[in-house]
Amino acid sequence: MTEVSMSLTGHLKELRTRLLIILLSFFLAFFVGLFVSKPLILFLQKDDLPKEVILHVFKVTDAFQIYIEMAFIIGLILVFPVILYQLWAFVKPGLHASEQRITLRYIPITFLLFLCGVVFSYVITFPFILKFMFQFAAELGVETTIGLATYFQFLLQIVLSFGVLFELPMVIMLLTRLSLITPNGMRRARKYAYFCLLIIAAFIAPPEILSHLMITIPLIGLYEISIVVSGFTVRRMDKEMNMKKML
């Protein structure tokens, strides 16, 4: 067997081991989610909804479906740091010692950004959209009837989307380090980026202008923060390059 094929076999075994660890970790996290899901669903109903609004089930399977979906989402969130670490461990042999230290720091920051997106959308964006919709329905003299599945799927759509989108600064930092983008390039592409963010917000928000703005504005803020992050990364890379030249 050649050295290349042995190396390939070793990488495949390593990949299988990492995937197995992720899979087992997810099953454990999903098991935890089964215990947490029910009290979390009860809390979210009491915390978000006005007292006069009652959730309904329109299909026999709705309640159980949401229970399993919530447990699945909890499992994914809990296993997210494990996925990041296993990914880092897989590519670690191909990195220099300094790169290993830097990229390892990305793991807690990435997870923290995801949680910040979830918390931000749950505390600010989602309540605003919900309050506006209920008030608008009341002004029209319409009684609000919400399905359990529809409500929680909408909630998850908002908070998970924001969790993912809050990773933008980290993605920009990585792309900047790979010399794929620059802060000046991001500034020049600002109007195109804003247009793309408007389209992304349209997929997340209901078809209503205020709700759409409540999602678009934070996304634009994230883009501007990402430009700053990209600039900081470029300056740091230049500093590292100058230090290497001095050695």
UniProtKB/Swiss-Prot annotation:
Domain of life: Bacteria
Bilayer topology annotation: Multi-pass membrane protein
Molecular function as annotated in GO: proton motive force dependent protein transmembrane transporter activity
Cellular compartments annotated: Cell membrane
Transmembrane segments annotated in the record for this chain: 21-41, 71-91, 109-129, 154-174, 195-215
Any one Gene Ontology cellular component term annotated for this protein: TAT protein transport complex
Biological processes per GO annotation: intracellular protein transmembrane transport; protein transport by the Tat complex
Entry keywords, A to Z: Cell membrane, Membrane, Protein transport, Translocation, Transmembrane, Transmembrane helix, Transport
NCBIfam families named among the record's database cross-references: tatC
Function: Part of the twin-arginine translocation (Tat) system that transports large folded proteins containing a characteristic twin-arginine motif in their signal peptide across membranes.
The protein's assembly and partners: Forms a complex with TatA.
Family: Belongs to the TatC family.
Protein name: Sec-independent protein translocase protein TatC
Naturally occurring in which organism (per UniProt): Listeria innocua serovar 6a (strain ATCC BAA-680 / CLIP 11262)
